[in-house]
């Protein structure tokens, strides 16, 4: 995920950390994915870019690598919402100050929407301060959290009681 407002840093030999890798796992090879739950607005670019489509834009372009996939630009006409990209752009703002690797609730919320329905189980093997569990509870999912540090478990239990 891309941190829109990452913390400033003053290091002599590296840049600020403005992105972080997010890992998501499923138990099964075949799993449900509810992409409609995380669709995003197309944006204003579509109005000008799709205004005057040529005839070649209205038919599928063959893939340059022979993958069988190509693009049909006219499929974008009239759409208000589209599937998101594979980079989440989120602000780092969060009210949790009890853990060094805190992240906004919108981060686990996006994944919970994408891969689960109400009543499903969300596992967080790095519980930390419990943000994922708090969001899962709010979204009517069951949750399991694992952490090595007792103080993290205490903080997350406190947050879950308050939520």
Give residue spans per PLM region:
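Core catalytic lobe of class I
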Residues: 1-161
């Amino acid at each position: 995920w891309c941190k829109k407002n990452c913390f400033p840093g003053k290091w002599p030999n590296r840049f600020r950390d403005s992105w972080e890798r997010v890992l998501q796992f499923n138990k099964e090879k075949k799993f449900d994915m509810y992409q409609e739950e995380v669709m995003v607005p197309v944006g204003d670019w579509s109005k000008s870019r799709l205004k005057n489509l040529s005839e070649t834009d209205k038919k599928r372009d063959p893939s340059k690598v022979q993958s069988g996939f190509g693009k049909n630009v006219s499929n974008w006409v009239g759409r208000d919402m589209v599937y998101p990209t594979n980079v989440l752009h989120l602000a780092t703002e969060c009210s949790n100050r009890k853990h060094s690797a805190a992240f906004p609730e919108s981060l686990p919320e996006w994944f919970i929407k994408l891969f689960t329905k109400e009543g499903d189980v969300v596992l967080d093997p790095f519980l930390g301060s419990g943000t994922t569990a708090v969001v899962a509870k709010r979204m009517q999912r069951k949750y399991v959290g694992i952490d090595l540090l007792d103080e993290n478990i205490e903080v997350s239990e406190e947050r879950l009681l308050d939520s």
